[in-house]
Amino acid sequence: MQRLDPWHGRCDLQFHATNGSTKHQGGCTAPFKLLRSERGEDGRCELPVLHTAGGLVGGDQLSLDFKLEANSRGLITSVAAQKVYGSIGRSRLQPEGCFAHQQVRCSLASGSDLEWLPQELVLYADALFEQQLTVTLPQDASFLSAEIVRLGRTAAGETLQQGRWRSSLTIQRLAGESSTWELADRVELGGASLESPHGLGGAPVFGTLVWAAPMAMGAETTASVLEGARADREGLTGTMRCGALNQGLIARYSGESSRDARFWFSRIWERTRTIRGLTRPRIPRVWPLQEQPLRRQTSTVNAFEAAAETH
């Protein structure tokens, strides 16, 4: 039986600021494809990335490398949910299965601002997936990411079964020749941890938002941001917790609804813009049109309405 080589897709992008707006250059290889970028109200380059293969199988690799020059601003998202198909027991050559891998590297220069907001990751039964997100940035740069994973196709009555999901997230602050860790986070979900009360407790959805702020916020500002993020949980289901980093915050979601995770993270995303005096975020055009996570209930700042009823 002939063994096919795994697919390795690459996406290398550079962002540079000019005349108050940010432009990108670079390119990608199959299965990646770049769609038309848009200019945000703050001059930010908003760029959707399409994965044309329709999903990942064991052995596939994705490598994304983003470099932001001084004072540039970017928002990168995916066009659709990423699917990872089952691997265990699918091959006579490797009945134990093989991990698919994704590695994202982000390098930010002084005064730059990157928002990495991919759509949901869906692991099918017996899927094996490992992801790495590595960020380096100076003290005055901003990085925000929000990633959500669904472990099993819940609507079809499916669980992850023997599958596993691994995640490594590291954020390193650079100051001349020295550096400090803003965050070093490693998570592995599979087996007993899916049902354990010390793991997901049977919840199929897990998400993490992290923001490395471009300024020292101080105790009072940090407490205010966290209080607001906790208030943003109103009307949403699931377990939602948040806490402070040295210079930023981290938020976790676990529950039944990827929509509620997305709504909560979107509201925190808006807060990270507001605290810096930036324009309200604009929901990317490739996100589900029926959802309006930032719609306000009243004119009161940071009061929101979850418009969609489906999960």
From Swiss-Prot:
<keyword id="KW-0996">Nickel insertion</keyword>
<dbReference type="GO" id="GO:0005737">
    <property type="term" value="C:cytoplasm"/>
</dbReference>
<dbReference type="GO" id="GO:0016151">
    <property type="term" value="F:nickel cation binding"/>
</dbReference>
<dbReference type="InterPro" id="IPR002669">
    <property type="entry name" value="UreD"/>
</dbReference>
<dbReference type="Pfam" id="PF01774">
    <property type="entry name" value="UreD"/>
</dbReference>
<keyword id="KW-0963">Cytoplasm</keyword>
<protein>
    <recommendedName>
        <fullName>Urease accessory protein UreD</fullName>
    </recommendedName>
</protein>
<comment type="similarity">
    <text>Belongs to the UreD family.</text>
</comment>
<keyword id="KW-0143">Chaperone</keyword>
<comment type="function">
    <text>Required for maturation of urease via the functional incorporation of the urease nickel metallocenter.</text>
</comment>
<comment type="subunit">
    <text>UreD, UreF and UreG form a complex that acts as a GTP-hydrolysis-dependent molecular chaperone, activating the urease apoprotein by helping to assemble the nickel containing metallocenter of UreC. The UreE protein probably delivers the nickel.</text>
</comment>
